[in-house]
Amino acid sequence: MIARIWSGESSLWRLLLPLSWLYGLVSGAIRLSYKLGLKRAWRAPVPVVVVGNLTAGGNGKTPVVIWLVEKLQQRGVRVGVVSRGYGGKAAAYPLLLTPETTTAEAGDEPVLIYQRTGAPVAVAPERAAAVKAILAAHNVQIIITDDGLQHYRLARDIEIVVIDGVRRFGNGWWLPAGPMRERASRLKTVDAAIVNGGVARAGEIPMQLAPGLAVNLRTGARCDVAQLSNIVAMAGIGHPPRFFATLEACGAHPQKCVPLADHQTLAPADVQALVGEGQTLVMTEKDAVKCRAFAEDNWWFLPVDARLSGEQPDKLLEHITSLVR
């Protein structure tokens, strides 16, 4: 229902307009207070790059963060990553991730980024505290914040917005009548706009999510996902239909698709109940970091990597690396 409201297919969004105006008024006032200097943002001693969204829901932000970390690492830059840690609850913050840190403590996206890149990752509701924790423990040259475009308490040097190229900005209204955290005009002030799927507009960087080989959660074995049979697909991400469409495009045709809430806690019994005899469970990599500890032999995940097109990605990377002392 919420997707139909935000896309404009349902007229129920009109009933939510008073709340949206209130949201827009409050969020605009917060940003203006920092812009006018009425509130002070904390500035880190190293450059900060924010990768975020203008809309609620999954846009492909985490693959972009991983892409950016890996590209900077390839250029010899020491990178740290901070996050709010949605879906996790630590005993104390800030929490600096270790190989033993669980998704219940840190959230699924920070654990995924940590496992994929090996970069230092810290989570905290207050991003500045997470940055300070990384700087105290690691000699990093730059910080990337996973989400946090609207977290103005942390000063930033570069702002990158990730846009779903198919859904774009829906009906264009602020939450909850629409998907917008900020107005689309905010794009005029960011350094780069990356468009995941669909058709990028002038000045935007086109991106596609490229699937790799399916990986078995227990053994690490790899195979073409189309070779798996009797698939049950599970996706606990911001926009599950994107994952199901990716499986179809790979030639894997699930018998059943199970959409879950983003950052949803996954109990072993609940996941096991999804798969019948002779069936194979295929999930996102973000779900896999939550399920690996209790995975069955017939559980697989499909990793995806961000593929950015054109000359703009290199120019963006050059701009970012030029900030590193």
From Swiss-Prot:
Reaction it catalyzes: a lipid A disaccharide + ATP = a lipid IVA + ADP + H(+)
Annotated SUPFAM superfamilies: P-loop containing nucleoside triphosphate hydrolases
Pathway: Glycolipid biosynthesis; lipid IV(A) biosynthesis; lipid IV(A) from (3R)-3-hydroxytetradecanoyl-[acyl-carrier-protein] and UDP-N-acetyl-alpha-D-glucosamine: step 6/6
Entry's EC annotation: 2.7.1.130
InterPro entries (UniProt xref): LpxK, P-loop_NTPase
GO cellular component entries: plasma membrane
Binding positions for ATP per the UniProt entry: 55-62
Enzyme class at the top of the EC tree: transferase
UniProt keyword list: ATP-binding, Kinase, Lipid A biosynthesis, Lipid biosynthesis, Lipid metabolism, Nucleotide-binding, Transferase
Pfam families, sorted: LpxK (PF02606)
GO aspect biological process, one term: lipopolysaccharide core region biosynthetic process
Family: Belongs to the LpxK family.
Name of this protein: Tetraacyldisaccharide 4'-kinase
